[in-house]
Each structure stands twice: as structure tokens, then as C-alpha cells.
Amino acid sequence: MAVSVDDFKYIDTSNEPTDQTAVHEKRLRAFMTALLDDVTADRRFELVPSSCAPNCPIQGPALRDRLRAASQAGAQILIIGGIHKMSTLVQLARTAAIDTTSQRVVFRKFFTFRGDNDEAWQRAERFVSEEVRDRLPESRSQQ
């Protein structure tokens, strides 16, 4: 199955006094790199490079245009998502997999994770990655 993964967006509404923008950007890049590596290593999938620039989820083209571009590049599924830091301890990761032809959401899932350090982000990435990769073949077979 050909899959494309757009960079996730990150939002911090925790109102913490310290500006953590740089560290969050670094952790999000590491999260995305690990997710792409996981998809690449999984023989069930062929990773199609994203046509979206790194800041695409926030300032890029509309989702329908991103789906069209992913489809034209050969992807059957486009994975999108974001992470929202809600408080000092709690973050929410959202993911969705969308069929690029029908533009139908194949699955959508919300994950919460605790902590805002490298270890917490790595744990979250492993869990999100496993869930996404396990759900993709299952959801495609139900179409």
C-alpha cells in the first residue's frame, strides 16, 4: 500500500512561562523522522514522499489539494496529524488516514500522552506509529 505522510503541526496552549518553541520543533522533527522511518521499514507499505513543505499543515495548500497531490504522486493513503500541548503534563496527538481517491477518512484517532521530554515524545511516536500502521491494512480491507 502506497502511503504519504505530511508533517504534523504543533500547537502549544499550555501558557507555560518558558518559550519552548525551539525544543518542541526539534522534538516534532524527531517524531516525524521516526514515523517516516517506521513506515519505510514496514514491508506492508511503500512510502511516497510528501508533496507538502515542512510548514504545510499550517500555511500550505488546502487538504483537498494535498490529497490530489499525494494521489498524483502515487499514494493511496495520506496520513495527517498534529500534536497539541494542552498543559504542562498533557499532550494530545491527532492522526487521520485519508484515501486519496475517494477523499474519505479511513480512520481517525486521538492519543493523549504525558510528559514533555524526549522520552515521552519517543514513547508517543512508537505508540502512534504502531496504531497507524496496524490500522491501515485493516481499514483498507473494509472498503
Regions found by a protein language model. Name each.
Residues 1-42, 135-143:
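A structural "domain/chain start" motif
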Residues 5, 30, 34, 42, ...:
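Extracytoplasmic
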Residues 28, 32-36, 95, 121, ...:
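Extracytoplasmic/secreted envelope proteins and their assembly/folding machinery
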Residues 40-80, 91:
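Short, solvent-exposed, polar/charged sequence segments at loop or secondary-structure edges
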Residues 48-54, 114, 124-130, 139-143:
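A general structural signal for short secondary-structure boundary/capping elements
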Residues 55-61, 95-113, 133-141:
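A short, terminal or domain-edge coil/loop segment
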Residues 76-117, 123-125:
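Amphipathic beta-strand/beta-sheet edge segments enriched in Tyr/Trp
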